[in-house]
């Protein structure tokens, strides 16, 4: 009888634990950390993952409702008025802009010690149409080098920052960042201008041949930049390649870095290794985390 009671008690505990796992996300995420399925995300960031998703959707929907189409260009561009200002975007990507603006509301690329500062010279790698360029300028950056390979995004950058380009505060580099000078095929997503990639194959993407690539080190040398204070890297899976071409810049200037780590499963491990190989003095902090495939991964990592 006693054994039977023990068995039933164990079964009851397992049922309660199972229900809690599925219906109470913080407990599930806690188990990921305990089980080693969150090798980079600390417990404090891990339990925020459901709220990160909720806030992203909430902000995106708010921005979308508050935005309106101002102008359509038959060349394939649209001008939108948003709560965060006016932006030219590629036609077909109208739902991408609110999503990217929502990410900035959440400050996913960091603030304070890990974000852009007043007087900075920044490299915005994967500038897209300029949402993060706006954030860097708003923080008081002296010079923003907007690096973007996709032709339609480059045109939007030129329209969105015409006056800043004229004054020299924004410099556009119409190339991708890689580990060497080269020309590669860029896979352009006609429905998501933020998903164009040299390395990720997405269904429906259109190949654009002979897109030029260069390295961060060469950009710094070619522009004769006196220093680099901050780098944002979100380039659809090519982040390790870009870091391999930035060793001198990281070693000499030790810029603050905000880097996307969600494109490939091994990036949360590989990216810190590459950064510290170039400059061992970097301190790392985990940014917002997300649940994926019964594990937790950081969307962004910060280095200073």
Language-model region placement:
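Phosphate/nucleotide-binding beta-alpha loop and adjacent structural elements of enzyme active sites
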Residues: 1-304
């Amino acid at each position: 009888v006693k054994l039977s009671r023990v068995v039933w008690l164990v079964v009851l505990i397992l049922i309660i634990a199972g229900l809690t796992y599925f219906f109470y996300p913080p407990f599930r995420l806690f188990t990921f950390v305990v089980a080693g399925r969150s090798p980079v995300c600390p417990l404090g960031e891990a339990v925020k993952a459901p709220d990160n998703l909720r806030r992203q959707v909430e902000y995106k929907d708010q921005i979308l409702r508050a935005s309106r189409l101002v102008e359509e260009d038959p060349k394939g561009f649209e001008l939108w008025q948003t709560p965060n200002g006016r932006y030219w975007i590629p036609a077909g990507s109208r739902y991408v802009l609110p999503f990217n603006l929502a990410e900035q509301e959440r400050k996913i690329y960091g603030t304070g010690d890990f974000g852009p500062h007043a007087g900075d010279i920044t490299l915005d790698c994967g500038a897209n149409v300029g949402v993060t360029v706006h954030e860097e300028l708003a923080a008081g950056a002296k010079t923003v080098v907007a690096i973007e390979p996709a032709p339609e995004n480059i045109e939007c950058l030129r329209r969105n920052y015409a006056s800043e380009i004229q004054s020299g505060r924004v410099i556009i580099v119409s190339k991708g960042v890689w580990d060497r000078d080269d020309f590669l095929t860029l896979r352009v997503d006609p429905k998501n201008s933020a998903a164009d990639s040299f390395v990720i194959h997405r269904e429906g993407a259109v190949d654009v041949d002979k897109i030029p690539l260069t390295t961060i080190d060469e950009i710094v040398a070619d522009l004769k930049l006196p220093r680099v204070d901050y780098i944002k890297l979100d380039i659809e899976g090519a982040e390790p390649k870009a870091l391999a071409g930035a060793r001198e810049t990281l070693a000499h200037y030790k810029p603050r870095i905000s880097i996307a780590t969600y494109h490939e499963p091994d990036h949360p491990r590989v990216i810190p290794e590459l950064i510290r190989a170039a400059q061992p003095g970097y301190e790392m902090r985990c940014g917002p985390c997300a649940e994926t495939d019964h594990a937790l991964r950081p969307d962004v990592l910060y280095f200073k």
